[in-house]
Amino acid sequence: VYGAIFSADRGAVDELLPRGLEPIRATPRRAAVTFLAVEYHRIGDDAMPPYDEFSVMFPAVETGARSWPLASLFTHGASGYVWYLPVTTEPAKALGVDIWGYPKEVAEIDHDAHVAGRRTTVSAEGRDVITLDVERAPAIDQVQEGASYTVEDGTLLREPLTLDGNLGAWPFSAQAEWTLGDHPRADRLRELDLGSRALARLWFDGEFVIGAGEPVGTV
């Protein structure tokens, strides 16, 4: 996994969150968006062929939960509301939609590894959505827990996440860049006034476990 966290307009992010969630603040007036470019090499007990994925997530907490500007991003940056989740195969889409309510769509995801890291381009319906170029962050072996939030049939779900492996985050990095395309999703992201410098770049290699969704409210 290569990823990065960028600041975004707080009001614009809040408009995209379902009722029951509020954005984690990067500053008093800014929220954040996390981009994650993922290669799944093995799914469960080889339940399906490997596939690629690109996550657009807004770091968020349940309404009323305590969070601290910026500090909470470094502990919850890979947690939050999953807004867009393109994948490269139909079985991967079906698994995510049917079990967890993830907003998965089939798209083209191209990874281009280079000496310092990896460049990932997502395109759908013949249009580019986003390109993310991230240098690998220093990592150590560790276990981290978090949560993703999705909406299914009008219910807000919380899915516990566990990451077990080599995980690293490097703050305030110029070694992560995004470029938006001409797809409608890109236009929506453009409206968020994304920051040009990453609040952090991320790298992970290990086991990623998603727990069953737990209802936490209605939307």
Residue ranges and their predicted role:
Residues 1-3, 23-143:
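Structured soluble/peripheral alpha/beta segments that form catalytic or ligand/cofactor-binding pockets
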Residues 18-25, 45-46, 164-165, 190:
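Intrinsically disordered, low-complexity boundary segments flanking structured domains
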Residues 86-219:
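Interaction-surface and assembly-scaffold signal
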Residues 1-24:
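Short, extreme N-terminal leader segments that mark the start of a protein/domain
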